[in-house]
A protein has these predicted regions:
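The feature captures the beta-strand-to-loop junction immediately N-terminal to the Walker
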Residues: 34-36
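ABC ATPase NBD coupling module
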Residues: 66-80, 85
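Conserved ABC ATPase "signature" region
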Residues: 109-124
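ABC ATPase nucleotide-binding domains
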Residues: 227-254
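Helix-to-loop junction immediately C-terminal to a conserved catalytic motif
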Residues: 49
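Catalytic Walker B motif of ABC-type/P-loop ATPase nucleotide-binding domains
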Residues: 155-159
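Conserved ABC transporter NBD signature motif
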Residues: 56-66
Length: 254
């Protein structure tokens, strides 16, 4: 296995956000990390990427290298991470934000330009980052991660599709699939289970800080099990997973 997590525990102060997670994944795959709010999804992937600020125990190895003991710079050479909320304090253009990849690992202008094209942000490149919409900002920081990322590396995405319209989601999903096809391992936190079903090869299901299930998409994304875990009824139509929306109209005042 390319990525091996052994007995991972993560704390927020005195509270355990992740408890004893052991799981693995191969390169060339897309792994969706799912679960309800507060289940430990983001804490887990941040710990894997080495950016979680709290205390953590256990080990993470990537291609045989112990990431738990690696320096931030060494880790960044093999692991690129995108947070769910883009934060750029300086007054940069989108192109300058993407070029920040060169502050982590040596990168040429060609790396930056390829990332710009891969995420379809050339029309945004010279605009102020702060003036972009939420979905546009997310695509720009994803392009920065792609500029930093070496094919065959580990890419960790925490809810990357938030604030994106359908066309933006489609563009990013296509880029993620291309990276996996080229040998990268992509971990992606998702709330949209239909998107997880369409995009991922494997699924890690977090529940109350523990790994409830992991394995191939078709076995973990079982409609009956998801209904019990999420409190929402699911069904498969033509092989695709979708939630069943049942109207609940409470009496209105007056």
């Amino acid at each position: 296995m390319s990525l091996v997590i052994d007995s991972m525990c993560v704390w927020h102060g005195a509270r355990a956000a992740v408890q004893g997670v052991s799981v693995s994944a191969r390169a060339g795959r897309i792994v969706a990390v799912i679960g309800r709010n507060g289940s430990g999804k983001s804490s887990l992937v941040r710990a894997i990427a080495g950016v979680h600020p709290g205390r953590r125990t256990g080990s993470t190895s990537w291609r045989g290298r112990d990431l738990s003991a690696a320096s931030a710079l060494d880790r960044a050479r093999g692991v690129a991470y995108v947070a769910q909320r883009p934060l750029v304090a300086a007054d940069f253009t989108a192109r300058e934000v993407i070029a920040l990849a060169g502050a982590v690992v040596p990168r040429t202008t060609e790396h930056v330009e390829r990332a710009i094209d891969a995420l379809g942000v050339r029309d945004l490149a010279d605009r102020p980052f702060a003036a972009l919409s939420g979905g546009e900002q997310q695509r720009v920081v994803l392009a920065r991660a792609l500029a930093q990322h070496d094919l065959g590396g580990l890419l960790v995405l925490d809810e990357p599709f938030n604030a994106m319209d359908l066309a933006e989601q489609h563009r990013v999903a296509g880029a993620v699939q291309c990276l996996a096809s080229a040998g990268s391992l992509v971990l992606v936190v998702l709330h949209d289970l239909a998107l997880a079903d369409a995009l991922a090869h494997e699924v890690w299901w977090m529940d109350a800080g523990r790994l409830r299930a992991s394995g191939p998409r078709e076995s973990v994304l079982d409609a009956a099990a998801l209904g019990q875990g999420f409190g929402v009824r699911f069904e498969r139509v033509g092989g695709s997973l979708r939630p069943v929306i049942a109207p609940r109209c409470e009496p209105l005042p007056g």
